[in-house]
């Protein structure tokens, strides 16, 4: 399951939570490094990536212009990890109680780059763009439950039952799903 929560169109707050495999404590700082991944150890790993997550530059770019917290725990670990960085600088890494999976919280995007902040569109436009990404993700992975909330209001909820028609119904509506 993946839950995406935003406030103010995602310009002040984004929280993405999954119930996946989590990250090892030593891998968490790598998540904000450019061109780094903990998912690939050998060349043959490229053939077998079966997990989702931020790729390549994405989280590094986000971490450079915002405050980021990563809370993660693997099923085999007794305790999770809370990693905090602000504008690309590591603030802390500490033990934390949390469920299996990963939560990434992004706040105050572009606070340190006001010129970039000016290029953001209206909150409703930015929020609609986030919803569109969630819908596309839900349609591409009908076996994963996807939930999206904007300013506390549920906008999307798919069952994750593996049925394309269920995902289409949740993302695009009854009429579209009925036409399938």
Annotated model-derived regions:
Residues 1-180:
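N-terminal phosphate-binding caps/lids of nucleotide- and nucleic-acid-binding domains
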């Amino acid at each position: 399951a993946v839950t995406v929560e935003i406030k103010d169109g995602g310009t002040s707050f984004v929280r993405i939570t999954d119930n996946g495999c989590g990250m090892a404590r030593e891998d968490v700082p790598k998540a904000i490094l450019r061109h780094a991944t903990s998912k690939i150890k050998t060349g043959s790993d490229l053939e077998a990536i079966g997990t989702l997550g931020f790729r390549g530059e994405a989280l590094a770019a986000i971490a450079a212009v915002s405050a980021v917290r990563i809370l993660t725990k693997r099923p085999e670990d007794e305790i999770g990890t809370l990693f905090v960085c602000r504008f690309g600088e590591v603030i802390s890494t500490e033990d934390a109680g949390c469920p299996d999976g990963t939560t990434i919280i992004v706040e105050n995007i572009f606070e340190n780059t006001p010129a970039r902040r000016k290029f953001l569109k209206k909150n409703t436009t930015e929020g609609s763009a986030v919803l569109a990404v969630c819908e596309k993700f839900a349609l591409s992975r009908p076996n994963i439950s996807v939930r999206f909330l904007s300013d506390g209001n549920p906008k999307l909820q798919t069952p994750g039952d593996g049925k394309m028609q269920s995902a289409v119904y949740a993302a695009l509506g009854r009429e579209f799903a009925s036409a399938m």
